[in-house]
């Protein structure tokens, strides 16, 4: 009985140390290849860097953002996409902190453009979100689409989905894209997409925050009840879910290292 008690105390201590002091700090770079049918040569090895769920609430989070910027710039991505939840709705940020965030995000380098969609936390202070992203040279895609050309006449169509309304504004298709790249905060919205053969990048789930070995994430929330892990094939669409960087109400992540994501396009 005493041995069992010691084991329990040890496991609880391990969970506390990992959940509060190890996993919420730092981050990893998760890299994946995305294979695309009939990918033009111009898009071979095209790099997409995804950042999600920063959920910045204090100066420590800002310092980590500086490290993210440094690692991101080392990788020299072609485009950068942010899939929502920039500032935690509960924060103690000052005006100076906000300006620091803008300067860091502005100095994120890529060959082409930076895109963003709006997360549920961003909706709670949309004016602040718009101020930061617009001043950081991110194009906010709020239920709208844009075409990305790169060394070729055939573009990628990039669409951003709002967390309030899953269906993007209908656009008259004047060009045939290589594929549709869909950016959305809520991964569960994949079930309602009108696209086919799309590649969707999302966040929000934090991969369940607490991940139990051989089981997976255990905390599911609105917008990420069905799809919380790395990758899913849903009909003809491919869904990639980032575990993101931050935490919400409690700075706790167990067995769940924060991450930024790099996707390389390759011809199938």
Label the predicted regions.
Residues 1-42:
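N-terminal membrane-anchoring alpha-helices
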Residues 35-49, 138, 146-159, 175-177, ...:
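Beta-strand-turn-beta hairpins that frame and shape the catalytic cleft
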Residues 42-141:
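Membrane-embedded segments
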Residues 48-50, 81-83, 158-160, 181-185, ...:
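Structural motif
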Residues 55, 86-87, 120-122, 145-146, ...:
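Catalytic metal-binding/acid-base residues of hydrolase active sites
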Residues 78-79, 115, 138-139, 156, ...:
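Short, Asp-centered acidic motifs that coordinate Mg2+ and/or phosphate
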Residues 131-138, 144-145, 150-184, 188-195, ...:
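Binuclear metal-dependent hydrolase catalytic cores centered on His/Asp/Glu-rich metal-binding motifs
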Residues 187-264:
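Conserved beta-sheet core of the metallophosphoesterase superfamily
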């Amino acid at each position: 009985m005493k041995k069992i008690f010691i084991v329990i105390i040890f496991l609880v201590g391990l969970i506390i140390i990992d959940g509060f002091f190890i996993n919420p700090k730092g981050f990893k770079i998760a890299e994946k290849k995305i294979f695309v049918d009939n990918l033009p040569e111009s898009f071979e090895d095209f790099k997409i860097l995804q950042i999600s769920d920063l959920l910045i609430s204090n100066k420590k989070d800002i310092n980590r953002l500086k490290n993210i910027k440094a690692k991101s710039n080392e990788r020299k991505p072609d485009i950068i996409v942010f899939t929502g939840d920039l500032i935690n709705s509960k924060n103690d940020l000052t005006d100076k902190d906000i300006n620091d965030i803008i300067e860091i995000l502005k100095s994120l380098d890529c060959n082409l453009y930076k895109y963003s969609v709006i997360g549920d936390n961003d909706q709670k202070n949309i004016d602040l979100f718009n101020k930061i992203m617009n001043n950081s040279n991110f194009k906010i895609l709020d239920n709208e689409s844009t075409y990305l050309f790169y060394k070729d006449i055939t573009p990628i169509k990039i669409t951003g989905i709002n967390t309030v309304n899953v269906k993007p504004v209908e656009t008259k298709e004047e060009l045939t894209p290589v594929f549709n790249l869909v950016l959305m905060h809520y991964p569960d919205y994949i079930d309602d997409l009108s696209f086919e053969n799309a590649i969707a990048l999302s966040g929000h789930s934090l991969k369940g925050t607490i991940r139990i070995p051989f089981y997976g994430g255990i905390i599911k929330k609105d917008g990420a009840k069905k799809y919380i892990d790395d990758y899913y094939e849903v009909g003809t669409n491919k869904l990639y879910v980032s575990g993101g960087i931050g935490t919400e109400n409690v700075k706790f992540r167990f067995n769940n290292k924060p991450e930024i994501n790099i996707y390389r396009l390759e011809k199938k």
